[in-house]
Amino acid sequence: MLKQPEMILIDVDGTLVDSVPDLTFCTDTMMERLGLPLRGETKVRQWVGNGVERLIKRALVDNMEGEPEEDLYQKAETIFLALYADNTSKRSHLYPGVNEGLAWLKSQGYRVGCVTNKAAQFTYPLLTELGIIDYFEIVISGDTLPEKKPHPAPLLHAASHFGIAPEKALMIGDSISDVKAARAANFQIVCLSYGYNHGVDIRDSQPDSVIDSLIEIKNLLSQAA
């Protein structure tokens, strides 16, 4: 059973927002401009979750692992970042239950923050345009600190900001990166079943609980000790 938290941090991509449609558009447009084969949404959905740099590299080599030639990567990154700046939220959407779940958390007085590996230049427009930025008292992006998830630093930074002990904090995410960061920071961790985890069932990573919609956090926390 979960212990009652005082602070809750929530991941963005794959947890609150399905951003794959925009990431696929940018990836395939980048590939087209480079004269390379398009990769499509099914592959992009498997590749997301470790930041834009890894997504671009995976698209270039058509594999989860591997490194493209540096000059090709630099050219691709320039194209992708320009595209994504204009396509952060045009096709992306909130998952069902997100607005309701966030509203409930705020109504109950939880301190709520956002921790993502997405760069700030993309995070703030995305959260703003989807209408959820005001739910968060702090937003920690992938370039806020020298380290990002699965390193515990972003989570511990938020705990310090709120003045709350890590053992009284909860992370809500969707991937093994979120689980690793939470365990290393001594946070509890709840995962959404539908997110981006490279095709692997998130239950295999043994989070404290798994839910199918953010609105289910209401029942989970109502039963917390």
UniProtKB/Swiss-Prot annotation:
It catalyses: 2-phosphoglycolate + H2O = glycolate + phosphate. One of its GO terms (molecular function) is metal ion binding. Pathway: Organic acid metabolism; glycolate biosynthesis; glycolate from 2-phosphoglycolate: step 1/1. The active site is at D11. It is an enzyme of class 3 (hydrolase). Pfam families: HAD_2. GO terms for biological process: carbohydrate metabolic process; DNA repair; glycolate biosynthetic process. Keywords: Carbohydrate metabolism, Hydrolase, Magnesium, Metal-binding. GO terms for cellular component: cytosol. It comes from the Bacteria. Its cofactor is Mg(2+). Mg(2+) binds at D11, D13, D174. Transmembrane segments: none annotated. Its EC number is 3.1.3.18. InterPro entries: HAD-like_hydrolase_sf, HAD-like_sf, HAD-SF_hydro_IA, HAD_2, HAD_sf, PGP-like_dom2, PGPase_prok. PANTHER family: PHOSPHOGLYCOLATE PHOSPHATASE. Specifically catalyzes the dephosphorylation of 2-phosphoglycolate. Is involved in the dissimilation of the intracellular 2-phosphoglycolate formed during the DNA repair of 3'-phosphoglycolate ends, a major class of DNA lesions induced by oxidative stress. Belongs to the HAD-like hydrolase superfamily. CbbY/CbbZ/Gph/YieH family. NCBIfam families: HAD-SF-IA-v1, HAD-SF-IA-v3, PGP_bact, PRK13222.1-2. This is Phosphoglycolate phosphatase. It comes from Nitrosococcus oceani (strain ATCC 19707 / BCRC 17464 / JCM 30415 / NCIMB 11848 / C-107).
